[in-house]
């Protein structure tokens, strides 16, 4: 496999997309799935939308194809992909659907949690207190902190 790469002068061992270095030897669908915010199914859909082979190694793509892929992923709205595949639907402020990648996704999630805390919603209060948010049981599971053992009294020698 390494010999095949050496024969191709244009092969890129590292491809940078959305501020992340991707391994050029991995197939396109698996390399894109390494990005936070893009799963395997979305990566296959993006590859088909851009007329790329999902099983082709990402390092074998030409510079123009990689640039096209980079612009498509870093743009928040993907043309031709259904809204239900996006990871951020019905934004609170704009009401639009879009897909966020890497740091943008982390920042948006933190902003949403802080907004819930500020509004004093039920979920926000649970986030503030560090409790479970989605209705899970609390009696026996989800305990945090170290267990404090029982201290026994020292027995007196007779």
Curated annotation (Swiss-Prot):
A Gene Ontology biological process term: translation
Pfam family name, one: Ribosomal_S13
Matching InterPro entries: Rbsml_uS13_C, Ribosomal_uS13, Ribosomal_uS13-like_H2TH, Ribosomal_uS13_archaeal, Ribosomal_uS13_CS
GO cellular component terms listed in the entry, alphabetical order: cytosol; small ribosomal subunit
GO molecular function, one term: structural constituent of ribosome
Similarity-based family: Belongs to the universal ribosomal protein uS13 family.
Protein name: Small ribosomal subunit protein uS13
Source organism of the structure: Picrophilus torridus (strain ATCC 700027 / DSM 9790 / JCM 10055 / NBRC 100828 / KAW 2/3)
Lineage: Archaea, Methanobacteriati, Thermoplasmatota, Thermoplasmata, Thermoplasmatales
Primary gene name: rps13
